[in-house]
Amino acid sequence: MTEQNLHWLSATEMAASVASNNLSPNEIAEAMIQRVDAVNPSINAIVQFDREQVTRDAAELSRQQEAGEKLGPLHGVPFTIKDLTAVDGLPTTFGMKPMADNIATGNAVVVDRLRGAGGLFLGKTNTPESGYYGGTDNHLYGPTHNPWKLGNSAGGSSGGASAAVAAGLGPLAEGSDGAGSVRIPSALCGVVGLKPTTGVIPQTILAGRFYNWAYHGPITRTVADNALMLDIMAGPDNADPLSIERAETSYVEASKGDVKGLRVAWSPNLGLGHVDPEVLAVCLDALAAFEELGAQITEATPQWGNPSESMWSGIWVPGFASEYDLLDWENQRGEVDDYLIEIMHEAERLTGVDVGRADAFRGDMWDTWTTFMNDYDVLVSPTLASATFPLRQFAPSWLEGASLREQLLDWLFTYPYNMLNNPAITVPAGFTADGRPVGLQIAARHRRDALVLRTAANFEAVRPWADKKPADSLVVA
């Protein structure tokens, strides 16, 4: 095994090699530092990186290995943390210049759990300001490029995390998802991203502890690694009053087994609007995999209307405004994005009646969803209406000139599942003719996270993607 290919090992492979003493955390760290130095300047995925600290941490993990101490399930495996999540002693900037000196005084629960499992913290990844849209650019660190097509969007808001995984900057990345922020960039970067059921992973991103729409999620290159990372991060914690007990069976074990007879509903757009014909064609081709696996496929779409207005006025706008209302927004022009300031002013125009109506719509949507899923086990769709598009473009070109809400939401097939709190995963479905990744989304009912992972793992078995990597000529300057 050489340093030249260590960075493409899965987390599962790395952990097994460390456990069998065929690989040391020191070797992993050296390979990863070289990879970050070579690739990150081109894509700007990791924005806080301390190579000396990585080396020191790896040395301690190697000492434990050499001493024959009990090793954790991620011993020596690199992971990154999104810059919305607290890491003790490092800035939690939210991608905002006014927060550049906001030094965390403790770790988020997920950071403690990943480190406690022996994981090697590699650095913090880029995010748009406050994680507010489906791309990754900000006034503090600049844009993150898609490793498959430089100059194009990596998606967001976990764009740095997804780009890092896609480019071989560690097999595991923590993301967070409030309207698709794990699944959007994972789809655009050709990796696996899971939004679990609300409460499976305790959230400490939002000050509002009873918010139930934004949660941490694992981003990986393989489904097995996704299940492994979820096993580490899952479980209740007093920091999150909505967190729930762990499943009795590990997600790694529960994701095994076939899907013969699985009732699959296929929807080309979830009833939400236009889909790029090439994206739809890639997803339709991928859908044939479920027939090969013995699943039963029916084209069907939940009749829940258009939930984007309720997502906007009932969740997104008031949620962001309440999280960041201490900043003096008008005096931050030029320091933060003008569109984010517009969202804050939009919140000032909302009334309690607006928010209440949106919440009522969400309840009706839940009823529609649960009734619909009485006939199906999973609902499969494109993850997004488009493959990646140029940086600094909010949305696909067909939404140019549309309202801010439409540009932010109307190309996403992800946010309904934040409103419903159920699990949804995106997996690589294939590529457009010019080599841009396309994602396929698999969703299931509340607390059926293991089923989502098992379905994704079976799909991966017949449509493998781990050997498909962006060319170094694209990502190395």
From Swiss-Prot:
Keywords: Hydrolase. Optimum pH is 7-8. At low pH values the enzyme is rapidly inactivated, whereas in basic medium inactivation is rather slow. The active site is at K82 (charge relay system), S157 (charge relay system), S181 (acyl-ester intermediate). Induction: By acetanilide. Amidase activity is completely suppressed by inhibitors of serine proteases (phenylmethylsulfonyl fluoride and diisopropyl fluorophosphate), partially inhibited by copper and mercury ions, but is not affected by inhibitors of aliphatic amidases (acetaldehyde and nitrophenyl disulfides) or by EDTA. GO terms for biological process: amide catabolic process. InterPro entries: Amidase, Amidase_CS, Amidase_dom, AS_sf. GO terms for molecular function: amidase activity; aminoacylase activity; aryl-acylamidase activity. It catalyses: a monocarboxylic acid amide + H2O = a monocarboxylate + NH4(+); an anilide + H2O = aniline + a carboxylate + H(+); an N-acyl-L-amino acid + H2O = an L-alpha-amino acid + a carboxylate; an N-acetyl-L-cysteine-S-conjugate + H2O = an S-substituted L-cysteine + acetate. Optimum temperature is 55 degrees Celsius. Shows a drastic decrease in activity above the optimal temperature. Is stable for 15 hours at 22 degrees Celsius and for 0.5 hour at 45 degrees Celsius. Belongs to the amidase family. This is Acylamidase. It comes from Rhodococcus erythropolis (Arthrobacter picolinophilus).
